[in-house]
Swiss-Prot record:
Name assigned to this protein: Thymidylate synthase
Function description: Catalyzes the reductive methylation of 2'-deoxyuridine-5'-monophosphate (dUMP) to 2'-deoxythymidine-5'-monophosphate (dTMP) while utilizing 5,10-methylenetetrahydrofolate (mTHF) as the methyl donor and reductant in the reaction, yielding dihydrofolate (DHF) as a by-product. This enzymatic reaction provides an intracellular de novo source of dTMP, an essential precursor for DNA biosynthesis.
InterPro entries assigned to the protein according to its UniProt record, in alphabetical order: Thymidate_synth/dCMP_Mease, Thymidate_synth/dCMP_Mease_dom, Thymidate_synth/dCMP_Mease_sf, Thymidylate_synthase, Thymidylate_synthase_AS
Keyword Cytoplasm: yes
Localization of this protein: Cytoplasm
Entry annotated with the keyword Oxidoreductase: no
Pathway assignment: Pyrimidine metabolism; dTTP biosynthesis
Length: 264
C-alpha cells in the first residue's frame, strides 16, 4: 500500500487549505487515481490496523438495501451512528440507491442485480455501472454519497472495478473504501465465475482534515508490510446471501492503530 502513503504525502505537500461542510478545515487536492492489482493481495492498509469487522458488515448492510443502523449496532459497528436519527434511520443512502433506485413511474431498480446479470450475459458492455448519486433524493439523505459511482469491466476472464469518490477523507475513510470495494470485486467475481483483476480508485476532492495532521505524519514514518490474502470460504447462491463468517483475512500483520476524530 505504498501508493496510499504517497497520496498522503502529496496532499501534505501540494494540498490547498480549504473550508468544508464540517467546519474542520482541510488540505485538499483535486483528482487522483490509484490502481490495485487484486491478484497481488488484498489492499488492506498495513501502516495502521484497520477494523475489518466494520468494513465487512457495512458492505453486507449496503447489499441488503438497509438504511437503518440497527444491524450495524447489533454487530458492534458504530461508523454510521453520528448521522442516524433517533430511530436509527439515515434516509435513502447507499443501500437504498443500490437496491431500490426509485423511478418517476413508481418502480424501483435493483442496480446490483442488474449489474450481475450484465456481467453474466453481456460482460463486454460499457454500461455495467452502479450509481448512488441520486440528485432527486440528496436532500433526504443523512449524508450525501462520498463513493458515488462505480463501473465493472471484464477482460481475459478477470473482473475489474473503478470507483469515483467525489469526496475522500484520506486518513480515516479511504482505507475503508479501498478494502470495501476490493471485497465487493471478490464477491462479484466469485458469483460470476471470474478471477479478480484490478480495483481502480479515482478521487475528486481528496483531503486531509486539519485535526488529522499529527496522525498522518506518524503513519508516514511507518514502512508498509506485505498485503494479506482474502479467503472466501464458500460460494453462496446469491450475492445477497454472504455472511460475515464467510470471509477470512490471512497474513494481516499491521502496525498499531492510530486514533483520530471523525469530522461530522
Amino acid at each position: 500500500m505504498k501508493q496510499y502513503l504517497e497520496l498522503m504525502k502529496k496532499v501534505l505537500d501540494e494540498g490547498t487549505p480549504k473550508n468544508d461542510r464540517t467546519g474542520t478545515g482541510t488540505l485538499s487536492i483535486f483528482g487522483h487515481q490509484m490502481r490495485f492489482n487484486l491478484q497481488e493481495g488484498f489492499p488492506l492498509v498495513t501502516t495502521k490496523r484497520c477494523h475489518l469487522r466494520s468494513i465487512i458488515h457495512e458492505l453486507l448492510w449496503f447489499l441488503q438495501g438497509d438504511t437503518n443502523v440497527a444491524y450495524l449496532r447489533e454487530n458492534n459497528v458504530s461508523i454510521w451512528d453520528e448521522w442516524a436519527d433517533e430511530n436509527g434511520n439515515l434516509g435513502p443512502v447507499y443501500g437504498h440507491q443500490w437496491r431500490a433506485w426509485p423511478t418517476p413511474d413508481g418502480r424501483h431498480i435493483d442496480q446490483i442485480t442488474t449489474v450481475l446479470n450484465q456481467l453474466k450475459n453481456d460482460p463486454d458492455s460499457r454500461r455495467i455501472i452502479v450509481s448512488a448519486w441520486n440528485v432527486g433524493e440528496l436532500d433526504k439523505m443523512a449524508l450525501a454519497p462520498c463513493h458515488a459511482f462505480f463501473q465493472f469491466y471484464v477482460a481475459d476472464g478477470k473482473l475489474s472495478c473503478q470507483l469515483y469518490q467525489r469526496s475522500c477523507d484520506v486518513f480515516l475513510g479511504l482505507p475503508f473504501n479501498i478494502a470495501s470495494y476490493a471485497l465487493l470485486v471478490h464477491m462479484m467475481a466469485q458469483q460470476c465465475d471470474l478471477e479478480v483483476g484490478d480495483f481502480v480508485w479515482t478521487g475528486g476532492d481528496t483531503h486531509l482534515y486539519s485535526n488529522h495532521m499529527e496522525q498522518t505524519h506518524l503513519q508516514l514514518t511507518r514502512e508498509p508490510r506485505a498485503l494479506p490474502k482474502l479467503v472466501i470460504k464458500r460460494k453462496p447462491e446469491s450475492i445477497f446471501d454472504y455472511r460475515f463468517e464467510d470471509f477470512e483475512i490471512e497474513g494481516y500483520d499491521p502496525h498499531p492503530g492510530i486514533k483520530a476524530p471523525v469530522a461530522i
